[in-house]
Amino acid sequence: MKKRSLGLVLGCALLLLAGACGTGQDETAGAIGEGSSQGSESESEGSSQEKIFGEFETVTLTGEPVTQEIFGEAKLTMVNIWATYCGPCIQEMPELAELAREYEDRGVQIVGLLSDVSEPEYATAMEIVEETGADYMHILPSAELQMNLLSRISAVPTTVFLDQEGNMTGSAYAGARSKEDWSGILEEILGEVGA
């Protein structure tokens, strides 16, 4: 009986680890990233052309000021919302860094948005970024981002794509993906935005 119970507990734990990590927020909070299983795509109603970020002022992990104007710096911005406690988030970061370099010439930028909202995690986040080689921009969650976006995220990683005006293009993607999967998604969205 003990072995069976232990097996059930371990099996459940593995299932949880295999997918996206919960945010610790109300799991019914919103439409963005609602499908919390690995690799799921969330078709949120009205997601196309929605300004999910709104106006914001924040800083990067290294302290530089950032506003919503960063989206105008590229034809397409891939925003990967991640957390320091999320294994799948951290595992995909090296490949996201490779994609950032490979797609830079095509007008694509990748931005990481840390969903951890307390300062002690910022040092941990910096260590993770350095260890994984994820040298693309990572921004911290301002009050505006917490209210307008992070409150609607039910799992990390969640990835969204934004055009130059900051409008969401396509769907929100919950869960980590391989470099090849992200490359295919990028190609599809670049075709849609005419880049």
Q: What does each model-found stretch correspond to?
A:
Residues 90-131, 143-148:
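Structural microenvironment flanking redox-active thiols in thiol-disulfide oxidoreductases
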Residues 16-20:
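C-terminal motif of bacterial Sec signal peptides marking the signal peptidase cleavage site
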Residues 80-85, 115:
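Aromatic-flanked redox-active Cys/Sec active sites in thiol-based oxidoreductases
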Residues 1-8:
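Bacterial N-terminal signal peptides that target proteins for export
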Residues 163-195:
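Thiol-/selenol-based redox modules, centered on thioredoxin-like
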Residues 126-162, 173:
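Short, internal strand/loop/helix patches
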Residues 22-25:
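Bacterial signal peptide processing site
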Residues 55-77:
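A short beta-strand-turn-helix
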